[in-house]
């Protein structure tokens, strides 16, 4: 099962550190994949949940490309990644609004809380006590609990 840290969180939410590059790096160095909230604004790559917060060099994404699940937070972020990596050859990215499930550029199903689909990524299953049977992976603020 793929274990994905939600915004860098490992043992619970930490809104002061979520999406901070050093926090993301720490989760990856501990062996987890990581979901990040990604913006593209004024030709800059930026991480942040509700708003762009942490500008990052493109090399941050290329360094961790095989461990990142990139949640595009604005249309420009999505179109920039499509331009750079059409078809998700390198990067695993997706966009959604209020959908139950999103399809990533690598063909993975990103299933939001309460949506059970076999072979999908269960996102924050602790919120709805979601079943993990037959899942490809889990994305959680408490990812350490799924080891």
Feature-to-residue mapping (PLM):
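Phosphate-group recognition and catalysis centered on beta-loop-alpha active-site segments
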Residues: 1-147
């Amino acid at each position: 099962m793929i274990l994905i840290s939600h915004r860098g969180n490992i043992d619970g939410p930490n809104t002061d550190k979520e999406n901070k590059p050093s926090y993301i790096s720490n989760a990856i160095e501990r062996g987890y994949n990581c979901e990040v909230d990604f913006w593209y604004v004024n030709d800059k790559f930026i991480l942040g949940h509700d708003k762009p917060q942490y500008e990052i060099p493109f090399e941050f994404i290329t360094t961790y490309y095989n461990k990142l699940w990139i949640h595009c937070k604005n249309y420009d972020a999505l179109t920039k990644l499509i331009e750079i990596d059409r078809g998700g050859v390198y990067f695993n990215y997706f966009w959604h609004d209020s959908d139950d499930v999103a399809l990533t550029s690598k063909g993975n199903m990103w299933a939001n809380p309460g949506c059970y689909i076999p072979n999908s990524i269960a996102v924050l299953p602790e919120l709805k006590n979601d079943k993990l049977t037959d899942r490809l992976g889990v994305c959680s603020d408490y990812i350490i609990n799924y080891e």
